[in-house]
């Protein structure tokens, strides 16, 4: 498609979304829930159509040599469709954040001042090969009163377009504008380039994908992003750690799932407990197929480990590889995380309350844990019900981004004729 045609098509999507966002701002909670329930029913009723569209994507992906793990994410099995439908119903059951107000403050002149939660407006979602994100993102944006433009990966185009039709049918069943959720129907990368610069139509972009995609968007976007580049997460075993807690937390933080952004990538161990804790932990990791890359002091205790380089401290492996460093103090652990961490999720294992409080205060990450594995970095685990992603931004949303993260606050004041003298 010529660049001028893509620009025209994207601008039309943006104009439609902006118009729909005004209607969504007025939508009742009952109407939004009706739409979500209708979508869930339509997913189950139209699974044959969905799977036929998905088969086109799978055939093309196989022919193109897509990795098996990515092929699995692409597949809309019966189980995957049922999961998406259940997810829609779960979002429908969540409290509606729109219109809620903070406690009001009574000013000396008698006026009341409060804040009201309102939608962000129009959200662009850019993601890679998982078609379930089409449903997840549509559900959260709809429930939070936003319009959204969805641009999925080229591998899932047919699946995403088919899912988009189901979402729009659900919106229409609830008398809501179909344009509140629109799927970009081209694989041309120029569409992404246009989307991330349409400041007059798009209020925020949420990218879901690999580091390369997000880095590109961060460098080129004119629209604000809610994002994280990577999840280089740390667990620090303090001198005052309970040995059994340290073992189970560190092991779970790494082995729960290697490919999630909350997986531990570097283990920091206080020198005072390294000799007593590391050998058993290293044996458990070895038995689980995890390769250890250690500092010189780690190699003295775990000779089977590979020597670590500075690149290892900076790497999000998303694989059964773990960097291990022995540190002399809490100060050194905090300094290491400040230098090499990504601001995602970091944890301390300790029975020392003052050390725990200091770690949580001084480690500048979006989530900081005491005596918990980093793999809890997930909106569902936080009680958010669902999440659009995890943000390491300092402005607006930080950490797992649920419904409230897709809203903002406006000031609302009530008076009785007061004037300013």
From Swiss-Prot:
Annotated localization: Cytoplasm
InterPro entries cross-referenced by the UniProt entry: Ald_DH/histidinol_DH, Ald_DH_C, Ald_DH_N, Aldehyde_DH_dom, G-glutamylP_reductase_CS, Glu-5-SA_DH, GPR_dom
PROSITE patterns: PROA
UniProt entry tagged with the keyword Cytoplasm: yes
Keyword annotations of the record: Amino-acid biosynthesis, Cytoplasm, NADP, Oxidoreductase, Proline biosynthesis
Enzyme class: oxidoreductase
Role of this protein: Catalyzes the NADPH-dependent reduction of L-glutamate 5-phosphate into L-glutamate 5-semialdehyde and phosphate. The product spontaneously undergoes cyclization to form 1-pyrroline-5-carboxylate.
Family in the record: Belongs to the gamma-glutamyl phosphate reductase family.
Name of protein: Gamma-glutamyl phosphate reductase
Record organism: Bordetella petrii (strain ATCC BAA-461 / DSM 12804 / CCUG 43448)
Gene: proA
């Amino acid at each position: 498609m010529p660049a001028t045609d893509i620009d025209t098509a994207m601008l039309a999507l943006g104009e439609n979304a902006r118009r729909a966002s005004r209607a969504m701002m007025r939508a009742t909670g009952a109407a939004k829930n009706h739409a979500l329930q209708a979508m869930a029913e339509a997913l189950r009723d139209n699974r044959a159509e969905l799977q036929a569209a998905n088969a086109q994507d799978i055939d093309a992906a196989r022919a193109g040599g897509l990795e098996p793990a990515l092929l699995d994410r692409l597949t809309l099995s019966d189980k995957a469709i049922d999961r998406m439908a259940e997810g829609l119903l779960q979002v429908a059951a969540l409290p509606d954040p729109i219109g809620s107000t903070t406690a009001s403050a009574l000013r000396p002149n008698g006026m009341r001042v409060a804040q009201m939660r309102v939608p962000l407006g129009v959200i662009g979602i850019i993601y890679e090969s998982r078609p379930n994100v089409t449903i997840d993102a549509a559900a959260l944006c709809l429930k939070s009163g936003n319009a959204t433009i969805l641009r999925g990966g080229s591998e899932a185009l047919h699946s995403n377009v088919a899912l988009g039709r189901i979402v729009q049918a659900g919106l229409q069943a609830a008398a809501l504008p179909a344009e509140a959720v629109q799927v970009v129907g081209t694989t041309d990368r120029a569409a992404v380039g246009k989307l991330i610069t349409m400041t007059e139509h798009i209020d925020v972009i949420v990218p879901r994908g690999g580091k390369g995609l997000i880095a590109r968007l961060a460098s080129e976007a004119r629209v604000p992003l809610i994002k994280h580049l990577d999840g280089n997460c740390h667990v620090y075993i303090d001198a005052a750690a309970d040995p059994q807690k340290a073992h189970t937390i560190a092991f779970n933080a790494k082995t729960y799932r290697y490919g999630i952004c909350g997986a531990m990538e570097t283990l920091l161990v206080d020198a005072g407990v390294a000799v007593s804790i590391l050998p058993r932990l290293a044996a458990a990791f070895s038995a689980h197929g995890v390769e250890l890359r250690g500092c010189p002091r780690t190699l003295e205790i775990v000779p089977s480990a590979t020597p670590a380089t500075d690149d290892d401290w900076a790497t999000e492996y998303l694989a059964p590889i773990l960097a291990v460093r022995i540190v002399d103090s809490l100060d050194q652990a905090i300094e290491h995380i400040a230098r090499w961490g990504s601001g995602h999720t970091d944890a301390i294992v300790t029975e020392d309350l003052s050390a725990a409080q200091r770690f949580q205060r001084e480690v500048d990450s979006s989530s900081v844990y005491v005596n918990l594995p980093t793999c809890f970095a997930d909106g569902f685990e936080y009680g958010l019900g669902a999440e659009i992603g995890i943000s390491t931004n300092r402005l607006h949303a930080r950490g797992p981004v649920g419904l409230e993260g897709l809203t903002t606050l406006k000031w609302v004041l009530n008076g009785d004729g007061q004037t300013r003298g």
